[in-house]
Every structure is written in C-alpha cells, then in structure tokens.
C-alpha cells in the first residue's frame, strides 16, 4: 500500500500479491510450454501423484508437487519451481469448495488430468455429495474446453459417466487390475487404483514396462500414508495423514481382511473426520457401525465428533472406548501399553494420531 516501501530494484509493487503470484505462475507455465498432468480427487491424490511422477521420471525430467502444496498458493509455487530443464509437470490440485479446481486449472493450464475418485470428503464446503462431483468435475470441464485428455479408471461408473457427459473430452480408459509383475509396497487393496493410474500414464507416454515396474516397486510411502510398520510390540497400519468417510470406509474394509500374522488381536484407533458439516453425525455413526463389524476388535475413538455419534447410537458396539483427544489416549497408552496387536491408526491430520506411533 505504500510505494515508499519499495526500496530495492528487485521489489515490484502490485495491487494484489496473491493475484500477482498466480498470474506470474501462469505466465511462467506458458513460457515453459511443457505437458502438465493435473491430479485431483477425494482420496489418493498425493499417493497417485508420487507414483505417476516416479514412473514418468523414468523417461522425462519431471517436476511434481512437493508434499501437498496443492491449493491456490501451493499450485503457483509448484509451477514457479519448474525450470527450463523440466520436461513434464505433475501438479496435485486440492479443493474444499466449488470453483477452486477451476481456478487452479486456469493457472496451471494442464493438458492431461486424473480424477482418482469422487468420495464423501469436504462435504461442508462443497455443500454435499453432488457438490463434490461438480467441484471435482471442474478439471474435466477445463480439459474438455481446451482439447485435453483424461485418464479414467474403467471400473469407476461415476468417473466414466462424468467423462462421457463432456462430449468434447478425450478419455483414456484403463483397467484397474494390475498386470503381472507389478508389485508395490502400499498397504490396502484400494491402493491398486492409484498404482493402476500410474501404470496407465506411463504406458501412454511410452515408458517401458520394465521401468514402470521398477518405479512402482521402489516407491515406499512416508508421511503416515498407507504405511505398515512392525514395532517391537505391535504391527501398525498408519494412515493418519487425512481421513474422510470414503477413505475411512476403505481402510476398515481392508483392515477386516488383514491377517493377524503373529498378532493376537486387532485394535482400531480412529480419529475424528473433519469438514463434514451437517453430514458429520451420520457419517461418524456409519463408520462406528463398520468398525463394529470387525470380529473381536477393540475400538478406540478419538475426538468429540466420534463421541457425539457414539452416544447417539441405540445399539453401541462392545469393547469401545472414547477419548476426547490424542493426548488423553497417549497418557492411557503410557500407563497401559498394548502388545501383540495389529493396529489401524486412521484419522484427520489435525487430530495428531501419528504421535501415538512411538507408544505402540
């Protein structure tokens, strides 16, 4: 607001710093003139981004979103980090309301896109499930208008329908059954969809099958996403970077099928799912009912949303304990350690369940 504050020739006075950042990133992207693949969806964005970028890196000089810098600030920063040596950009796009993907697409101007899935995430901001479909579909809208191409899992009727609704949109449909020899270190059957997307993208862009298998097989998840860890006392399935009803349900279905492999019991540590608005109570009750279907499992619920939902149930599952916070559960675990258990740890990142790992 004060021109006198500009005291260095490297400083530029602008009316809107955020708008200037976004416009600068857009212009930089245009000058690079490279293919850019945008990835969005309710679940699996970051994992798919990591897999896809590793596969493409077997043939191209790739720059991909670091961490989860996937919003109106993170996407411009990602684009500006690309250099003249970059041959391919992979950009993750997150959103919690309609209009946000449209903005990000107008900045990154992707040529290709992947929607991993349409699930029940950020229901409050999107205004419900239909809003999620409409908001995430903004990526398809952009690509349909600009002559782009999407990669669509052939077994997903929602995404297939969304692609078909846009008559000018070119679509590359791919199977979600993994080809022989493709192995990965991701926990959960649901992750095969992310792997299948990476395989499809690699093949489309001419990456040799052997290099695809190597790239997928060498990727090991971190940051508490789909990690299986054997401690001195227990086996942990850590998936607590984020949680919404769709990802929570997928984790529970997978956990029910997990063999004990030397453990004597199963324990679920489930943290609140956030940003669900009016749908919160019903979604948390549904997750509790799914958890109760896992035979002989001990259920530990963390946070006020799960507590409210649990107390509203007419029939409450046995062997369930409520904890107001991660800190209270941590204190309990210090007093009464658990051992020889297969433990699922799943919840929204802000609940802080990853801090329990050292106690398990």
Role assignments for model-derived ranges:
Residues 9-19:
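N-terminal pre-Walker A segment at the start of P-loop NTPase domains
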Residues 222-224, 240-250:
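Glycine-rich phosphate/pyrophosphate-binding beta-alpha loops
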């Amino acid at each position: 607001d004060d021109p006198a504050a500009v005291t260095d020739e490297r400083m530029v006075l602008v009316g809107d710093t955020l708008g200037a950042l976004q416009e600068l990133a857009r212009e930089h992207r245009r000058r690079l003139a490279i293919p850019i693949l945008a990835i969005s969806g309710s679940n699996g964005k970051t994992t798919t981004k990591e897999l896809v970028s590793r596969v493409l890196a077997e043939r191209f000089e790739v720059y991909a979103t670091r961490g989860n810098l996937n919003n109106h600030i993170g996407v411009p920063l990602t684009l500006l980090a690309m250099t003249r040596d970059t041959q391919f950009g992979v950009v993750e796009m997150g959103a919690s309301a309609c209009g946000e993907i449209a903005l990000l697409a107008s900045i990154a101007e992707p040529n290709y896109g992947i929607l991993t899935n349409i699930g029940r995430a950020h229901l409050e901001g999107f205004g419900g499930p239909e809003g999620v479909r409409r908001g995430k579909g903004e990526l398809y809208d952009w690509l349909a208008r600009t002559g782009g191409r999407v990669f669509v899992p052939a077994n997903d009727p929602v995404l297939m329908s969304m692609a078909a609704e846009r008559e000018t949109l070119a679509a590359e449909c791919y199977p979600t059954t993994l080809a022989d020899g493709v192995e990965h270190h991701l926990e959960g059957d649901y992750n095969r969809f992310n792997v299948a997307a990476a395989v499809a993208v690699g093949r489309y862009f001419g990456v040799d099958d052997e290099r695809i298998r190597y790239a997928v097989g060498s990727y090991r998840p971190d940051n508490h996403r789909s990690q299986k860890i054997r401690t001195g006392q227990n086996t942990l399935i850590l998936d607590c970077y984020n949680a919404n009803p769709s990802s929570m349900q997928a984790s529970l279905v997978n956990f029910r099928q997990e063999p004990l492999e030397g453990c004597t019991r199963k324990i679920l540590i489930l943290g609140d799912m956030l940003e669900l608005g009016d749908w919160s109570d019903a979604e948390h009750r549904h997750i509790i009912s799914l958890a109760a279907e896992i035979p002989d499992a001990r259920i530990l619920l963390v946070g006020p949303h799960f507590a409210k939902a649990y107390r509203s149930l007419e029939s409450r599952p046995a062997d369930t304990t409520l904890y107001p916070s991660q800190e209270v559960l941590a204190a309990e675990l210090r007093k009464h350690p658990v051992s020889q258990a297969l433990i699922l740890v799943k919840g929204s990142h802000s609940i802080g369940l990853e801090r329990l790992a050292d106690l398990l």
